[in-house]
């Protein structure tokens, strides 16, 4: 069928894609609103897309569908997964019940306003306007940094170990595989005499 309008066709809905709403991926064009994971419908971008033929996925769904089979495969360090492993017989303890407040001021207003969580890095109160959640804890935006190099993090770009958060690079260097050939990167020269 001839394309009289001259515009490219969206790889998902097959309608014309105009320049202002175009996202390109591996030679195909998409509407920004159509550039979603085929499985979970999350918005995608150049860093989160994985392509299989004509289909687009987020990296997590792509790994589950086309990656190596088995629990824990198809995801890198620091990837957040909602899979609790119940299909493998893994059981989780129930969360402890609500504990009474230790705040001596028991007014409802004081409990709502003063009962904020504490930042694991600086131990100060974290309020909603400055709260970032990562590794299951609330952090100040300014404290949400790699424990080793100080690089600012996002909830999708962190790895945690023993209650501390790291960028993926520092996590791999400090807690990744050890031994000959690891941690050198592509093109590293090894001199042996």
From Swiss-Prot:
Quaternary structure (record): Interacts with ASCC1; ASCC2 and TRIP4.
Classification via CDD domains: LIM1_CRP1 (cd09479), LIM2_CRP (cd09403)
Organism of derivation: Bos taurus
GO terms (BP aspect): muscle tissue development; sarcomere organization
Highest rank taxon of the organism: Eukaryota
Function: Could play a role in neuronal development.
Motif mapping: Nuclear localization signal: 64-69
Coiled-coil region: none
A GO CC term attached to the entry: cytoplasm
UniProt keyword list: Acetylation, LIM domain, Metal-binding, Nucleus, Phosphoprotein, Repeat, Zinc
Lineage of the organism: Eukaryota, Metazoa, Chordata, Craniata, Vertebrata
Main location: nucleus
Annotated Pfam families: LIM
Residue positions, PTM N6-acetyllysine: 84, 112, 131, 137, 161
Database matches in SMART domains: LIM
UniProt GO molecular function: actinin binding; metal ion binding; structural constituent of muscle
Alphabetized InterPro entries for the sequence: Znf_LIM
Name this protein carries in UniProt: Cysteine and glycine-rich protein 1
Subcellular location field: Nucleus
Modified sites of kind Phosphoserine: 81, 192
Domain LIM zinc-binding per the UniProt entry, residue ranges: 10-61, 119-170
């Amino acid at each position: 069928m001839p394309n009289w309008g001259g515009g490219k066709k969206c790889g998902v809905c097959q309608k014309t894609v105009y320049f202002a709403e175009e996202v390109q991926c591996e030679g195909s064009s998409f509407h920004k609103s159509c550039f979603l994971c085929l499985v979970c419908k999350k918005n995608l971008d150049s860093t989160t897309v994985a392509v299989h033929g004509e289909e687009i996925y987020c990296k997590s769904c792509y790994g589950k569908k086309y990656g190596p089979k088995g629990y824990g495969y198809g995801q890198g360090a620091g990837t957040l997964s909602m899979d609790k492993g119940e299909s493998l017989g893994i059981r989780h303890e129930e969360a402890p019940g609500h504990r009474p407040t230790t705040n001596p001021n028991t007014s409802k207003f004081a409990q709502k306003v003063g009962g904020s969580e504490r930042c694991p890095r600086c131990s100060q109160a974290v309020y909603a306007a400055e709260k970032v959640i990562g590794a299951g804890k609330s952090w100040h935006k300014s404290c949400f940094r790699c424990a080793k190099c100080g690089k600012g993090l996002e909830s999708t770009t962190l790895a945690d170990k023993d209650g501390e958060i790291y960028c993926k690079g520092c996590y791999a260097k400090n807690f990744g595989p050890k031994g000959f050939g690891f941690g050198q990167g592509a093109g590293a020269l090894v001199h042996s005499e």
